[in-house]
Amino acid sequence: MSLATPDGGPRRATIQSVERAARILKLLGAGSWRLGVTEVAERLGLAKGTAYGLLRTLEAQELVEQDPETGKYRLGPAMLQLGNAFLDNHELRARSLLWADSLASRGAEAVRVGVLHGSNVLIVHHVFRPDNSVQILEVGASIPWHACALGKAIAAYLPDAQRRSLLDSGLVPLTGRTVTDPATLEESLATVATAGVALEDQEAIVGEAEIAAPVFDDMGHSVGAIGVVGPVERLVPDGRVSATLLAAVRETSRGLSRDMGAGRVRSRGPAARP
Amino acid sequence: MSLATPDGGPRRATIQSVERAARILKLLGAGSWRLGVTEVAERLGLAKGTAYGLLRTLEAQELVEQDPETGKYRLGPAMLQLGNAFLDNHELRARSLLWADSLASRGAEAVRVGVLHGSNVLIVHHVFRPDNSVQILEVGASIPWHACALGKAIAAYLPDAQRRSLLDSGLVPLTGRTVTDPATLEESLATVATAGVALEDQEAIVGEAEIAAPVFDDMGHSVGAIGVVGPVERLVPDGRVSATLLAAVRETSRGLSRDMGAGRVRSRGPAARP
DNA sequence: GCATGTGTTCGACTATATCGAACACTGTTT
DNA sequence: AAACAGTGTTCGATATAGTCGAACACATGC
């Protein structure tokens, strides 16, 4: 009955049923199609009755929906609302709105803001390139950290231990140019750390590049990154990084970092009701 | 504290701790700022230790984050990812992408697609008006059903019992023109049902109007709605609804409904691997 | 310095979640 | 037709696993 804690991590008390419920949610979210009770039970190693009870409870909360025809389950609408609520409460995102807008118009490129989540970068804000082209919204998407400039910018300023674990955790290639060797990646992170800016040249999507810089809080931790994405021809013309964009990104990240740091140091909880 | 199940639905067993965990998440999502353990415990009527255990478990799953400085809790990044996963699995949204795009360019207005969630309409897709103006993305937002055309369009075709409960559940005014009287609202729903299209004229935001039509699945249930939003001057010039937009919305909703119905009737699970 | 606040820990109690087998139902196979 | 292999669902016995409440350590403000 006892689930052994994997690789002898610190054994903190966790509530079993809630953990299982969370894993069900992630399971439904990961696989891109609806699952049945038996499939859920199998994949999590639970009794069918147990999985059913959990699903029923989640359904009552509208975190999960059941297709009335097939009886299978999928994520529910409350999930979207909570996801949105996360964004509303997100400090980095809130503070980045104005900076991202101005960076987008100044650089005439799309802007993304991301934070580290596991070994991926989670996009928390996205401003479209200011032209009429059709673009898809990427907020909520997650990108392997080593395949985007945002991720490298964050990783470069992480405490050693954390950076190590990132480097060691399965680096999968997305394009032919994705760097997956930990050693060379570590070197490039050192370069990023001295330059203060990270680059990505078709390592995630062929034809697209990114220039990004880290964002720090008042403790000096890299809590996220902001950068511009766009076609290689414009970001890296003739193999050289556009100096204009580079300066714009750097200055924006500094301004945003100042915002983040100042918010905590100067006044403790200015927005809270007294 | 107890939400009465609409029309006396059967009360089944639910797992206590999971339900409590879900309520914690909603609490963190609703109040727009981070909460402490004691506050959570108070608002849910739990022992402090219990609330702590739940929060710890949710934190381990990254559904909740703890501010290392203040010790207070907020929603975590996994929430955003799950919210996004909900969208990816959402059938109506998936099928509406193309229709919404074409409606937006045909009508030169912003397009929204929504579903009913509780007594609100949850926006699951949003196409910006095809001009260069700055617009904010509304996906994930929820709007009181009686204050938007999407909501009226859905409600007009709901089973009697469900429509009743909507009419009876606290209708709050958002602007001076919001209709909050159940009787007059019911009348207007009857009109909507015969016309096949719903209107909204500055009932949610001053200066903005909306034209929407319902979307049906193969069972004939109104599972959502699609419509255009924009300034009153363009949607309702001189007090008359733009005939062009009205036709466009109507035709789009019919096409989308056909998509939704056809997907289920013709082939059972065409997208599933064999 | 005390008084109040916080988040956190711990152990005893029993309410509570888990299991596993049996159920009703559907569509397919024989 | 009838037996089969699936599904989601129900139910009751068992002891596990979650809940409570008091005590803890730490921070803040009087």
Which stretches of residues belong to each language-model region?
Chain A
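Juxtadomain coupling helices with adjacent low-complexity linkers
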Residues: 195, 206, 223-274
